[in-house]
Structure formats: structure tokens, C-alpha cells
Amino acid sequence: DNPEKMARMRDWLEIAAREVDVDPSVLTDVEQPLLDMVSVISHGPSRPGAPLTAFLVGIATAQGGDTLQLVKKLMQAAEQRGQTRD
């Protein structure tokens, strides 16, 4: 992606994380996999479902799930679902 857009995204996410009392560094290792997942879902099974899927990953992670494994599982499910788009 465009480096300027990515810098703005990171600036925003730092603000957002602080607003909800989350250490912004939690995104370091999962940023690109989450962005990839959202892209696959938004261009595949459901555009409006993409951000909500990311929310579900966050909830599952908070319940003890492994973020990267969850992302991988959901990307596989989205790819199996095909290219039908809402």
C-alpha cells in the first residue's frame, strides 16, 4: 500500500488504541495479516462483513485465541466461500 496512507493508518490506530486503553503495540505482528484478511473478505464473501470479522477476531483473541491462527482460518473460510459479494 501507499506509505503515506499506511502512516496515516498507524497514526489513527495509535490514537484509537489509546482511546480504548489498549497498548498500540498489540498490532505490530498482526497488522498485515488482519489487513490481508479484511481485503479477502471485502473482495469476496462480504464487504460489510469484513470489519465485523476483524471485530470477531479481536473478541476471539481476548478469549484466548491465537490471532494469526484465527486470521488464517477465516481467510480459508472466505476463500472457500468464493467470490460472491454483498
For each predicted feature, which ranges?
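C-terminal binding/interaction regions
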Residues: D1-A17, G65-D86
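Generic N-terminal targeting/processing segments that precede catalytic cores or assembly contacts
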Residues: D1-P3, R18, V22-P24, D29
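Residue-level detector of functional hotspots within protein domains
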Residues: M6-R8, V20, V38, P45
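Short alpha-helical scaffold segments that flank and stabilize functional sites
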Residues: E19-V20, V57, T61, R81
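Amphipathic, hydrophobic secondary-structure cores in small proteins
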Residues: S25-L27, E31-A62
